[in-house]
Amino acid sequence: AYGHVMFLRIRNQVDPVSRGFLVDDFDPDFPPLCWACDEARDQGGIVIWCHNGQGMEAPIAAVLGKLDAFNLFDPFWMDPEYDIWYKLMNCGIKLPASTGTDWFICSNNRVYVQMDEKFGYDGWLEGMQKGRTFITNGPALFLNVEDKGPGDIVRFRDDRKVNVRVSWRSHYPINRLAMVHNGRVVKRRNFREGSYEGEWEAELPVDSNGWIAVRCNGVARDSYNQALYAHTSPVYLQNGKQNPYQTKDAEYFLKSIDKSEEWVRHTGRYTNDDQRNAVMEVFEKGRKAYEKLAKT
């Protein structure tokens, strides 16, 4: 119910590996995942939220700054997870895109990281933390906004237009390409016959803090019969004016916290009230953060 996380570059196993009904019908829903995230971070680890954007602790861990990346298309496209990711970024949370194949599923899902140095594990992880990624099961997709790439910040004053450049190459043809600004598709291109490579340049009006990303998909299927897709991490926009969707999306997460706390109070299984209260405290920290964002 809380969700699922993945840790990279940890020196010691973070226990417990699993709790609740995945262990047995009587195992307690304790401790919360945020505690595990803290333990991994204390070891210098990287924390990635995995294929469960609807897990109760996802918005909590994100707003409290415990996540380095957010898995999507893991193991397949699920609209609600993208919607949650978009809403989190509208709240000003910088959250790079990652992906994977899940533990028992074979697929072509991969996250690619742009690096500034010779390839190496630590440099790759640093690039992921900086948000210099795109996720894909085939197409290579690249984004440039005012000469800035994914993970970078475009700073500006007042209202203006920004130059957005997109390029792609794919072994199988893509059929749809979309520019996404603050979670809304603002420009799109359709390729009825499919496109294997190309470039696209456009001007987008911007007037507030926010983000721009690009995504593509196609009717072709990869070798595991999944529809073709790719999505970049965002380029962030910053001019000091609040993202127009911040209040609404922060309120969305406040409502989700209401439901989560109701579950903790009446459905969650705990050995004693101290455990239940400790979990409630984690959700209350998240609530305070979103209340601040909703009122800003």
Where is each model-derived feature located?
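C-terminal functional module detector
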Residues: 15, 91-97, 101-296
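Catalytic cores of extracellular degradative/oxidative enzymes
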Residues: 1-93
